[in-house]
Amino acid sequence: MSDLAKEKARLLKKRGSLSSLGSHEVRAIGKTKDSISTLSYMEEHGHHDDIQRPTVQMENTYRITPSRRFPVLTVKDLLKDVLTSYLQEEKYETELCRQMTKTITEVVKARVKDLMIPRYKIIVVISIGQIKDQNIRMGSRCLWDDNHDNFSSHIFKNNSLFAAATVFGVYFE
């Protein structure tokens, strides 16, 4: 066997693949030619030394309490303002209200994030329904820390529709 073939067999044996060897080379080194494993890429160590990646060091804050509490009254005023401005003159239409729910949710979420409340996860739930002499009862249950987590909600009504909006602020430790 030539030196080139021996070197190729040695490299392939080192990588765990013999599938690319010719049948006479396989017989010469005593392996079967029915090898299944192949290697399509192998990173050689030492070739990427010239590429320098900046190291970013992050330190733990060890903060377990918020520096600023969730502003319930500010968020309630924000909900009142957004719901009134978007729904004051609207009549209930199924498709319009479906799209309006998504739009109002995104607007409320963006405005609450603009308050820059650090380390709080913001969850916004908006429900819009038609007023037709019916009763509705809505509720929510949460597993959270009473000392740090909170919520704010507002109910809006006009002649043809109602909207219930709730914003949950959950502290992220």
Swiss-Prot record:
Transmembrane segments: none annotated. One of its GO terms (cellular component) is cytoplasmic dynein complex. CDD domains: DLC-like_TCTEX1D1. Gene3D superfamilies: Tctex-1 (3.30.1140.40). GO terms for biological process: cilium assembly; microtubule-based movement. One of its GO terms (molecular function) is dynein intermediate chain binding. Pfam families: Tctex-1 (PF03645). Belongs to the dynein light chain Tctex-type family. This is Dynein light chain Tctex-type 5.
